[in-house]
Amino acid sequence: MLITLEGIDGAGKSTLYEGLKTRLQDLEPVFTKEPGSPLVNSAVRREIGANRDPFAEATLFVADHAAHLAQVVLPALEEKKLVISDRYSDSRFAYQQVSLIGIVPDPKAWLTAVHAGWSVRPDLTILLLISPETAMNRLHERPGKEHFEDPAFLEEVQKKYLERVTEDPERFLLIDAAQEPETILDFVEKSIRALPRQ
């Protein structure tokens, strides 16, 4: 079973991810994240920090996803393990669909085409929803800054996430990320434990 954690920067994905690592040890899940492939991840981070090209950045994220699937996700799923990933393909359909506007004619169609036939659909996606203003307040407390951290940009990204929900509603569990982290963790843990095991 593949479970993914999604949401805009500052929504609390990493906090939830780390909490689940502690809470779900008895299930022996494989915890992973994107970007995660060591070689591609370093290139992605360089691109984010440099004079970036959104198309090059998007292709690097797709390459990382391919490596992540081949090296981590598919082997674990073949062994019938529970896989929990901090970010996955929905991040591309949210972030890159916005960043590629004006660069490719139809960002959604391009992203759909490059993922078609090989990317694996998650069994459950936990989407943390929060106002961009609250997310920005949280991000300002973090060291470092990435170009994605802009309230107008984050608002558009969250809209793209919600479009994904409309297209595949049965896959998503929506969470109000303005709640206390422990409240969110309790609810998500119970939700995961209630899932039928494959």
Swiss-Prot record:
Coiled-coil region(s) at which residues? none
Question: What SUPFAM superfamilies is this protein classified in?
Answer: P-loop containing nucleoside triphosphate hydrolases (SSF52540)
The portions of this protein that span the membrane are none
Please provide the Gene Ontology terms (biological process) for this protein: dTDP biosynthetic process; dTTP biosynthetic process; dUDP biosynthetic process
User: InterPro entries, alphabetically?
Assistant: P-loop_NTPase (IPR027417), Thymidylate_kin-like_dom (IPR039430), Thymidylate_kinase (IPR018094)
GO CC terms of this entry: cytoplasm
Give the superkingdom in one word.
Archaea
> What does the record give as EC number?
2.7.4.9
Write out the GO MF terms. Answer: ATP binding; dTMP kinase activity
Q: What class of enzyme is it?
A: transferase
Q: Which HAMAP family match?
A: Thymidylate_kinase (MF_00165)
Family affiliation? Belongs to the thymidylate kinase family.
Per its record, how is this protein called by name?
Probable thymidylate kinase
Species whose genome carries this gene = Methanocorpusculum labreanum (strain ATCC 43576 / DSM 4855 / Z)
Upper lineage: Archaea, Methanobacteriati, Methanobacteriota, Stenosarchaea group, Methanomicrobia
Q: Which gene encodes it?
A: tmk
